[in-house]
Amino acid sequence: MISPLFFASEGGFGLNLDLFDANIVNLAIVIFGLYKFLPPFIGGILERRRVAIMADLQDSEDRLLKATEALAAAKKDLAAAHQKAEQIREDCKLRAEAIRLDSEKRTVEEMARVKQGATADLNAEASRASAQLRREAARMAIENALSALPGKLNTEAQSKLVSQSIKNLGEA
């Protein structure tokens, strides 16, 4: 086998064929390079990511705040709308009650007017009928008296009775 130090023994640049030693040296170089150069690079990436996440969080918080304010305003508007609807409902009930009472009042007044008119018509008809019956009764009484009297009265008494009967008929 070839000695690992063979190639390096001449001086200058040589190959180290001992894999374990070579890997440790390579790992040390890589770890040193990562330690020296990677933190600023990864730190920059992580910082940009942190800034983006913070901006997203701030945006989310702003949207949450706006949504909460909008929800509160909507609830306030809803409560105001419910209150206005209740007020309108109460106003409608009061107006309907006023209209109903007014209608009842007008109906009662109309019924009273019709009743008064009917009573007045009935009284007028009763008065007319009563006057007609009195006239008819007086006429019949005069006719009966006139037919019975010619044999009982003389001409002068008969003429006086007819004049008085005509006078009574004129007053009635």
Curated annotation (Swiss-Prot):
Q: Quaternary structure?
A: F-type ATPases have 2 components, F(1) - the catalytic core - and F(0) - the membrane proton channel. F(1) has five subunits: alpha(3), beta(3), gamma(1), delta(1), epsilon(1). F(0) has four main subunits: a(1), b(1), b'(1) and c(10-14). The alpha and beta chains form an alternating ring which encloses part of the gamma chain. F(1) is attached to F(0) by a central stalk formed by the gamma and epsilon chains, while a peripheral stalk is formed by the delta, b and b' chains.
Q: Does the UniProt entry include the keyword Transmembrane?
A: yes
| Membrane topology designation | Single-pass membrane protein
What are the GO cellular component annotations? plasma membrane-derived thylakoid membrane; proton-transporting ATP synthase complex
Source organism of this protein record: Prochlorococcus marinus (strain MIT 9313)
HAMAP family per the UniProt record, alphabetical: ATP_synth_b_bprime
Q: What is this protein called?
A: ATP synthase subunit b
Role played? F(1)F(0) ATP synthase produces ATP from ADP in the presence of a proton or sodium gradient. F-type ATPases consist of two structural domains, F(1) containing the extramembraneous catalytic core and F(0) containing the membrane proton channel, linked together by a central stalk and a peripheral stalk. During catalysis, ATP synthesis in the catalytic domain of F(1) is coupled via a rotary mechanism of the central stalk subunits to proton translocation.
Q: Which PANTHER family does the UniProt record give?
A: ATP SYNTHASE SUBUNIT B, CHLOROPLASTIC (PTHR34264:SF3)
Q: Which family does it belong to?
A: Belongs to the ATPase B chain family.
Give this protein's Gene Ontology molecular function annotations. proton-transporting ATP synthase activity, rotational mechanism
